[in-house]
């Protein structure tokens, strides 16, 4: 694509504004140098990566990437044999390794498809990172802990400095030297500790003059008493520098062996930072990727620069569906140009794998070139008029464009007589049609409007205009023709009436009729579009209601099947129980050689009724009824009903339960009787689940709670131990799902603490 087109459509300006979403200069440079992608396969891969990253970002609400240093030069230097990196360069490599570790850890919690390769390029080097952290501090100084020798040398340096200090303090405080001392100060000159002495008294203090003040009134003397110590200090500092160089060489050599991993990780970090920047822009303005296709349909499109600069902007629909040409008409008030530039810029941004501010359902083609003719191209240097410059640019555009390109013309053709401009403009549109090139053009010329109305290659549209404020509304009305508004604006701005009347008399009746018809036509189109909008809204509501109904029907069918499965299982279990009891009776008959057990069995079972689902549903639960929780065996008596809940007494424990969780059973006066009595089991007020799997523990706990209720316990303990917390969490999740009103908490420390959960039933 031509750089002049990118500039004209403000693509570079957009990228510059987008780059403000990152604090990293290297990422900013990469973003500012982005170019639209024309290869479909490559673009789809980049969009897939951006979409996958954004979904992770939106799910987590953050990404662990902030400002990081640019280590490009350090990487290049480390690749040079025998080179030694500076402490700052090594520290910054350590910073990058820390960021890589954090990002890798964060992404490890997500299933990656399109980002997998980029993720694999992140290589945390924890040992190297620790070496660097232990060796260099945030002020880029080598730490004492970098080596034992360095720690020893620095300790000696401090000791010698202390001795020098003490010696010089004695001289400074000696009464015999007070008239010779310029200031009680110990300072450094030429890396040696000295004291300031008045020039006229320099002979009083024996030593070496290391420096003189700019005024000449002060000399800096190194007393002979500290010369040996200063010499020793100099030697120690040389040793320190050699040891630091040795440490830096060691660290650089390690870095050099890992330089490819570091380089790949750094490149991957930059790519993730670019994706992060794109995702932040997308989230801020509710952007999305349109579907790639042949048609060009952008719904509620917004100009991104308006958004980034927080300027008000009315969303527009840009539609090139079955037709490949769109001509936008209307007065010269800026609305047409904004629509044209919005279409071009959004296409460029999309082809940079950046989501754009449009609504769901939008579609867009991939263009191999987007070319625009806009503005005043007058060139003094090339001695070209505005018209000549436009013609030269249009010729180049038409030479470069093909059926996969997008041509944008702002006002066909400016800078010349309207009749000639109309003729050339129509000829250009005809040429574009012959070459089957997509085109969006703007015009206010009536002949071009008439041509477009009679040509099925093009769709015509008009930009709305507010007659009160004399400004464009920016809304695009399709199948409408824009008025010139010249007379109306002149009249509104109080141009002399006789001038307006004279002007009208100079215009042909055909043109006035055309403008009048265009105005009426636009009004009808607006009314028609409003009706269509209402119909579409009703259609959407109908679709939603239909979807709700279908989902409800599916759920009812599912519930019905599940209910019948439960009923069938109950019947099968019941039949199996009867069969087993029958076997026991037959066995007893054989053993006793008597029919009495059989007669008793028949008598007990002959009055058993199996009710249908409908009969069970028809029964209403009321006070005094014997009920049980669906799926459970314990039975209780309803003692009160309030709205959709019942208070049930289970062997002394009273619990409020939703009615839809209860099922009615025959009360005890009917033929088949049930009675809740306290069992004579040896159940204790605690259960030990340690050593069991999650499934085993929950199954055993379920049985235990049934018995606890029957025994009348209001408090019990669940012993699950500490471990990894799996059993504890499973127990508490199970308790949360129970229909009983209960509370639970960790046991006191002396009763087991976190390894024991205490449960209390509440009335």
From Swiss-Prot:
Ranges in coiled-coil conformation: none
DNA-binding in keyword set: yes
TM region(s), chain numbering: none
InterPro entries linked to this entry: DNA_mismatch_repair_MutS_C, DNA_mismatch_repair_MutS_core, DNA_mismatch_repair_MutS_sf, MSSS, MutS, MutS2, P-loop_NTPase, Smr_dom
Function: Endonuclease that is involved in the suppression of homologous recombination and thus may have a key role in the control of bacterial genetic diversity.
Similarity-based family: Belongs to the DNA mismatch repair MutS family. MutS2 subfamily.
Name of the protein this chain belongs to: Endonuclease MutS2
Gene that encodes the chain: mutS2
